[in-house]
């Protein structure tokens, strides 16, 4: 449960016991619940921030500490890729708590890249509409693609290509790839 910091600490402890040569992380867990600025609750905001921001921050720090503690060579394969959302560049008022948490994740990506270099590269991918939102019908899903500047949206294959690029581009850190 990523809203329970004790569970997150236990996850990190168990991981470090089993994987001393841990060098990479993709932060893909996420909570995506609808609310607006007029109706958000502190409980919903805290859940979004815990899952979409605080837990990834803890995991990134744990990975960095593992690299240093185990004197893992400062190679460019030590990396984090955060999955955020293209909403960070195309704000709209829906999914208020979710959007705030992804904006925080964007800042986390840049701050972590600065804080953990040169031992750890930290980048992010910000996909747009790839999958339908909960309760979104097929027609509305297809219409939403047309709101993109290219009149289409990213695909799962685009996401894989971005992951491959960031994984293998050893000179890139602090970058957010918008899809």
Provide a role label for each language-model segment.
Residues 72-117, 129-130:
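Catalytic loop of short-chain dehydrogenase/reductase
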Residues 1-4:
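Rossmann-fold cofactor-recognition segment
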Residues 124-149, 153, 158:
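A glycine/serine/threonine-rich, flexible loop-to-helix segment
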Residues 106, 116-130, 172-179:
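Conserved Rossmann-fold SDR core element
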Residues 36-37, 41-49, 144-145:
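Substrate-binding pocket helix/loop in short-chain dehydrogenase/reductase
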Residues 28-34:
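Conserved NAD(P)H cofactor-binding loop of Rossmann-fold oxidoreductase domains
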Residues 155-179:
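C-terminal substrate-recognition "lid" of short-chain dehydrogenase/reductases
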């Amino acid at each position: 449960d990523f809203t329970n910091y004790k569970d997150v600490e236990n996850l990190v402890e168990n991981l470090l016991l089993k994987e001393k040569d841990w060098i990479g992380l993709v932060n893909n867990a996420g909570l995506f619940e609808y609310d607006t600025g007029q109706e958000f609750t502190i409980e919903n905001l805290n859940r979004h921030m815990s899952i979409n921001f605080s837990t990834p921050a803890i995991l990134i720090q744990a990975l960095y500490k593992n690299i240093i503690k185990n004197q893992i060579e400062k190679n460019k394969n030590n990396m984090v890729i955060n999955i955020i959302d293209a909403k960070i560049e195309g704000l709209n008022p829906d999914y208020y708590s979710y959007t705030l948490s992804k904006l925080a994740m964007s800042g986390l990506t840049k701050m972590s890249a600065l804080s953990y270099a040169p031992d750890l590269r930290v980048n992010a991918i910000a996909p747009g509409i790839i999958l339908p939102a909960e309760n979104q019908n097929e027609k509305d899903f297809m219409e939403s693609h047309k709101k993109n500047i290219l009149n289409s949206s990213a695909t799962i294959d685009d996401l894989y290509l971005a992951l491959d690029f960031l994984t293998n581009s050893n000179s890139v850190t602090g970058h957010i790839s918008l899809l």
